[in-house]
Amino acid sequence: NKLNFSLIGDPALTLAYPDYQIQVDEFAGVNVAEETNTYPQVKAGSKITVKGRILTPEGALAEDFTGTVHPTVLDSKEEVTTLDNRGEGAYTYTERSKTLFSGSDSVRQGRFEFTFPVPLDINYSDEEGLLSLYALDAVHSNEAGGAFDRFLVGGTDDDVSLADTLGPKITIYLNTPDFSSGGQTNTTPLFVAELEDADGINTVGNGIGHDLSLSIDG
């Protein structure tokens, strides 16, 4: 029945957007604090440094904001087509389905800086990517949010190095870090795998062998 619908929540409620804003000042060595026609290039194999600040609701530098910033870098948009399981016709739409980087870094006196590696299997589209940012000052219970999309994803860095032949360091345990191999567990143990790599871990999933997977007794 096309007249049936479900109402979840109150449409009159204000969305819980952070009061503080995040502004990106520098991206890949380019001053982007002001609107310009210069779009930095995010190339495969490069390392990009981002600098920014936290702004109060009034637009001033939040010098008392100290905490953690969580950046997420998404690839350019790409077309995705549904499987047409119902035989009613496939639907094509665009979305950012690939995450190039997800991490965290510190915020001190309202300012932050972080560097992220760009994987080789990007879209190479020379179209806009997206940097989504969230920051938290747990001491003062302040949150900040922001986004930046004035950069292009494509090309390969001239100084790209393929010398990384070492896999990530993997620490595996059940329930607690004190667990020793062959030890006893309860009937429903929690499996934990901690991965660490100085060059980053590629989870884009755009190539063979780049998906994280777990095989038990396989």
Question: Can you name each region flagged by the protein language model?
Answer:
Residues N1-T56:
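Caspase-like cysteine protease fold
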Residues P117, Y134-A138, E196:
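Beta-strand-rich extracellular modules
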Residues E35-P71, D178-L214:
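Contiguous beta-strand segments within globular domains
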Residues T72-G87, L214-G218:
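Short aromatic-acidic-glycine turn motif
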Residues V139-K169:
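Short beta-strand elements
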Residues A28-E35, T171-F179:
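Short, solvent-exposed loop/edge segments of extracellular or virion-exposed proteins
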Residues Y93-P117, N123:
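Aromatic sugar-binding surface patches on proteins
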Residues L120-L130:
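Short glycine/proline/serine/threonine-rich loop/turn segments at secondary-structure transition edges
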